[in-house]
Amino acid sequence: MGKLGKEIVKLDVDILLKKLNSALADEWLAYYQYWIGAKIVKGPMKDAVISELDIHATEELGHATLIAARIVQLGGTPVLSPDEWAKVAGCRSE
């Protein structure tokens, strides 16, 4: 977004980038939870559960891809490591 665009919408890009990085961290953590869940699931309905978890993981990865692209478009740097994801994520997993 250019300078004029920022002035028109009265946007603080630094605040937006912080929120986008938080959302990106949430998406990466959700992706990982679905992905790893699909690897460790057991039981008689295992195949159906794996299929469902893989679908959700793919959706979360798609969200992460879109958010990362927007961060770069705005001149920011996406959070780069799992340590950073845990620090900036809006949701907390236990």
Task: Please state what every model-predicted region is.
Residues 8-20, 84-94:
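Acidic/His metal-coordination segments adjacent to aromatic residues that form catalytic metal sites
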Residues 1-11, 33:
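Short alpha-helical hairpin
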Residues 30-37, 41-83:
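Conserved alpha-helical segments that form or flank metal/cofactor-binding pockets of metalloenzymes
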Residues 16-26, 30, 56:
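Amphipathic alpha-helix face/heptad-repeat signature
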